[in-house]
Amino acid sequence: MLTLRSACQLTTKNLGLHKCISKTVISALGRRGYHSENYETSKISGKKALILENALEHVPQLGFTEDAIVQGGQALGYSNLSKALFPSGPMDLISYFFLKQRYALSSLKPHLTTIPETSGRVVQLIWSRLQGNRDIVQHLPQMIAICTYPSNLRKSLSSLAELSDEILYLAQDKSADFQWYTKRAAISAIYSASELFMSRDTSPNFEATYNFVQHRIQHAKALNDLRNDVLEWGSFQLNAVRSILRSRGI
């Protein structure tokens, strides 16, 4: 639950949050990653994966909450273990959701071969990942708020970095290392901004969100002029938190 104290910490002008984001971005986004085919089958397995998989079925109704995790455990007969197994609570459920949605992008490989330009493939990948939010779109503001808590920021940035890795790999980007790092951070910025936009989108089939993604990629000049998108990343995160706090009357 968002407390007044955490709200004050999150809304302390730009200085505190941007310092925190800057340090964490360097750590989370500063290493060249790998496609999920090179990762272990899953970072979450066994009993935990079963509980979280069941918990996701309750997210459309309950949101990313401890109640959803408890319901997921109870369906498997683990009525007393759910909270003990997931010390980060809702963030553990969100991380599993991110992981599952990222892995699903590999199914686009055949379609991506029909798109000639890298920028077009990136648009398709970002849009497809956003489509994974359809069933839980009403809970996106809650999810964004949880991800932006200081205690969860490193984990959420790590998930975002892995998503950017996946998108660049599947888009068959062949950049040299320095340019690749810039693109990775920029895709993280564009995806974060698009997800925030989607949380407010009331257009049919989220058409406005799709147009927003296209515009951001075009604005980046086919992924060659990305500095502004990188610099705007922190501002989008800060605005997301402020919007959520305002909606809750804090």
UniProtKB/Swiss-Prot annotation:
This is Ubiquinone biosynthesis protein coq9, mitochondrial. GO terms for cellular component: mitochondrial inner membrane; mitochondrion. A 1,2-diacylglycero-3-phosphoethanolamine binds at residues 181-184. It comes from the Eukaryota. InterPro entries: COQ9_C, Ubiq_biosynth_COQ9. Pathway: Cofactor biosynthesis; ubiquinone biosynthesis. It holds the Pfam family COQ9. One of its GO terms (biological process) is ubiquinone biosynthetic process. Coiled coil: none annotated. Belongs to the COQ9 family. Membrane-associated protein that warps the membrane surface to access and bind aromatic isoprenes with high specificity, including ubiquinone (CoQ) isoprene intermediates and presents them directly to coq7, therefore facilitating the coq7-mediated hydroxylase step. Participates in the biosynthesis of coenzyme Q, also named ubiquinone, an essential lipid-soluble electron transporter for aerobic cellular respiration.
